């Protein structure tokens, strides 16, 4: 039993160190200047935490909600949509922001998807591998996890191997979308992993 608790303590300390490293990397990358996504192949690690600008069109009928996302302890979803990058045969998955869950799980919020040629700014995030999964996830309006390969097959375009967390309102859309984009910066000061370790 003691060995288990020791292992858990070291595991928590390792998680805290990983989060500290991510915070340092994120701060250093934010000073590198904005990268324009042109549809060229990009490695996930070379783009991680970079500020980007992307122009293109959201792929019609492909928006979905990523379940089990909280904002200020309120249950909700991240609104995800692939954007076909202008002048290319590639797309990038955009995390458009957070929306609260309805009064019940059966009430799925409707979020309009902007149409036409658009431009937005964001920060690159690399999705965490999900490891073991019980079954293939159906192509549905609400998903439990990201599967970039499945989304790529669904839309018929190659997806860049990362997600852009949208920071700005979409230019040229004419309306605000009401989504919350209060993305947390990785923080070493408030990391519970350090306290548990």
Language model regions located:
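Surface-exposed, charge/polar-rich loops and edge strands
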Residues: 1-45, 49-197
């Amino acid at each position: 039993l003691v060995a288990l608790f020791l292992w858990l303590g070291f595991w928590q300390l390792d998680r805290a160190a990983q989060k500290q490293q991510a915070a340092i990397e994120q701060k250093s990358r934010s000073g590198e200047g904005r990268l324009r996504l042109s549809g060229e192949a990009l490695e996930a690690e070379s783009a991680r935490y970079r500020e980007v600008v992307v122009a293109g069109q959201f792929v019609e009928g492909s928006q979905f909600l990523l379940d089990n996302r909280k904002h200020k302890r309120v249950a909700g979803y991240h609104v995800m949509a692939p954007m076909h990058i202008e002048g290319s045969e590639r797309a990038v998955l955009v995390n458009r922001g957070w929306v609260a869950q309805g009064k019940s799980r059966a009430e799925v919020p409707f979020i309009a998807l902007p149409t036409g040629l658009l431009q937005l700014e964001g920060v690159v995030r690399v999705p965490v591998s999900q490891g073991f999964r019980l079954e293939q996830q159906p192509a549905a309006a609400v998903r439990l996890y990201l599967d970039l390969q499945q989304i790529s097959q669904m839309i018929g375009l190659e997806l860049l191997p990362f997600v852009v967390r949208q920071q700005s309102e979409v230019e040229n859309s004419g309306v605000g979308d009401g989504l919350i984009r209060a993305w947390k910066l990785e923080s070493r000061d408030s990391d519970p992993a350090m306290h548990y370790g």
